[in-house]
Amino acid sequence: MQPEPRPSGAGAHTQFLPLRSQRPEGAGDTVMYASTECKAEVTPSQHGNRTFSYTLEDHTKQAFGIMNELRLSQQLCDVTLQVKYEDAPAAQFMAHKVVLASSSPVFKAMFTNGLREQGMEVVSIEGIHPKVMERLIEFAYTASISMGEKCVLHVMNGAVMYQIDSVVRACSDFLVQQLDPSNAIGIANFAEQIGCAELHQRAREYIYMHFGEVAKQEEFFNLSHCQLVTLISRDDLNVRCESEVFHACINWVKYDCEQRRFYVQALLRAVRCHSLTPHFLQMQLQKCEILQSDSRCKDYLVKIFQELTLHKPTQVMPCRAPKVGRLIYTAGGYFRQSLSYLEAYNPSDGTWLRLADLQVPRSGLAGCVVGGLLYAVGGRNNSPDGNTDSSALDCYNPMTNQWSPCAPMSVPRNRIGVGVIDGHIYAVGGSHGCIHHNSVERYEPERDEWHLVAPMLTRRIGVGVAVLNRLLYAVGGFDGTNRLNSAECYYPERNEWRMITPMNTIRSGAGVCVLHNCIYAAGGYDGQDQLNSVERYDVETETWTFVAPMKHRRSALGITVHQGRIYVLGGYDGHTFLDSVECYDPDTDTWSEVTRMTSGRSGVGVAVTMEPCRKQIDQQNCTC
């Protein structure tokens, strides 16, 4: 007989007890089982003590699957839920308390905290539809839920009642994806009623962002006057012009004029009426029947019309600032030759986007925004083949990332200045060859037409232009002989120019903008040097005062205002085409260098508008 093999290691041995057939006391049949007595001895390995671990990954799923089978076959269930909801037929659902308690804090409290339901086998449930309860019970066992679109609100409401947060989040995410102008208000109201803050916030943001479309829907006309006033009072309402808000309010009143005409005055005070154009106000005062029958509202709008046409500085509500990304756009420019670049800078994260190029390279152009669209006006194409002054007006749509040509100006204008009043673009001065213009023309986007208006009192190229209180200011420049410190102001109602207090410094090619009811003139060229000095014009006192200088001297710079700060971009310092970007904080009277452009350049057109549609950019980049 062969000896039994011994385990490796000195003195090591293992004994296993075989399965024994025993007859437990009181048992009629033989039962095979292993003895609980273990006399085995295992010698540790040479590597020291080790731990054996094993996990069955799908055990939980399998276990809950078996429990669900037991539920469906009504085995081992220890509770019956008797669900009654309004006029719906009552229904009974058998389940296991431990499973319900594991998925719902409400059921857990019901079955474990000494409540009367803890010892009950039949529990009455009210306030939830049986079909909703059926789905929530099924979710407790399967971690899966499915329903038709029309049932989502009911299931979400039930999940909120029983604090099943995962189902609440899933329903909320689904409803966010379904947001539409026709249902956004209803979803927002529902979310508010059930206390789902995240869904309520997302729905409200959708309403603010798509106000123009939402205001055409039935849900909008069913708002209470308090809800409507709250909505149109939002600073972040996304509208192309304030007339959208005005028309929405008038249409809401007309929906039930007999009951709602008493709310017109409250609504008008929530509309940013000082952002409406005098022409628009005049037309409404003449033609709107609701205003005709309300003398107080009519007088209120007449007062605003007078303030606008008299160009009075007024303490009014701030302009709308929708929570959509607003970027600083730079078009064209010059570095050795004219450029066709269109780029956008995001001050919030410091990134640059390369967008659709201008159709023709240009420098010395100007940029402005009307109705969210970016316009590139005039300039010159300096190229190795020759120089061509431009009369072109091109329009860029951020939503499509495409340029489209508009009607050209009456004459080419290089080193032009532009401003916008009442949605109309004013092209000021500039040059065509050796001709230095004092002419000014106005573009009406809705008609795609240019019309000459009164010429300036002085010929100006490299002129800085700004608009404040519906007045157009032309600052500095070059008249063909002298660089200028003079400035003048255009009154659109009178169609005339008037001289104002001259600057402290001669400046041609300065950057001019408006911030906090003051006009700023930054940098420029005085005939000898590029400048870094900055001065500010107070229209109340009619005086220019110096503020902190820029860190770099620069002329032919780009300038704009973004979120209450001035940004200057590029330019020429007398030796180098600059790529630096500086930012001015009026609260601290300090400049800081915030970023660099992708390359140095001067003579760019700059303006601020909405972030472009990334989908369009990605698609067009893929086709290149």
Swiss-Prot record:
Annotated crosslink N5-[4-(S-L-cysteinyl)-5-methyl-1H-imidazol-2-yl]-L-ornithine (Cys-Arg) (interchain with R-135 in KEAP1) location: 151
Entry-annotated residues carrying S-nitrosocysteine: 151
Key word Ubl conjugation present: yes
Highest taxon of source: Eukaryota
Gene Ontology MF: a single term: disordered domain specific binding
GO CC aspect terms: actin filament; centriolar satellite; Cul3-RING ubiquitin ligase complex; cytoplasm; cytosol; endoplasmic reticulum; inclusion body; midbody
InterPro entries recorded: BACK, BTB-kelch_protein, BTB/POZ_dom, KEAP1_BACK, KEAP1_BTB_POZ_dom, Kelch-typ_b-propeller, Kelch_1, SKP1/BTB/POZ_sf
Localization per Swiss-Prot or TrEMBL: Cytoplasm; Nucleus
Cross-link (N5-[4-(S-L-cysteinyl)-5-methyl-1H-imidazol-2-yl]-L-ornithine (Arg-Cys) (interchain with C-151 in KEAP1)): 135
Kelch repeat locations: 327-372, 373-423, 424-470, 471-517, 519-564, 565-611
Record family assignment: Belongs to the KEAP1 family.
Biological role: Substrate-specific adapter of a BCR (BTB-CUL3-RBX1) E3 ubiquitin ligase complex that regulates the response to oxidative stress by targeting NFE2L2/NRF2 for ubiquitination. KEAP1 acts as a key sensor of oxidative and electrophilic stress: in normal conditions, the BCR(KEAP1) complex mediates ubiquitination and degradation of NFE2L2/NRF2, a transcription factor regulating expression of many cytoprotective genes.
Subunit structure and binding partners: Component of the BCR(KEAP1) E3 ubiquitin ligase complex, at least composed of 2 molecules of CUL3, 2 molecules of KEAP1, and RBX1. Interacts with NFE2L2/NRF2; the interaction is direct. Forms a ternary complex with NFE2L2/NRF2 and PGAM5. Interacts with (phosphorylated) SQSTM1/p62; the interaction is direct and inactivates the BCR(KEAP1) complex by sequestering it in inclusion bodies, promoting its degradation. Interacts with NFE2L1. Interacts with BPTF and PTMA. Interacts with MAP1LC3B. Interacts indirectly with ENC1. Interacts with SESN1 and SESN2. Interacts with HSP90AA1 and HSP90AB1.
Name by which UniProt lists this protein: Kelch-like ECH-associated protein 1
Organism for this UniProt entry: Sus scrofa
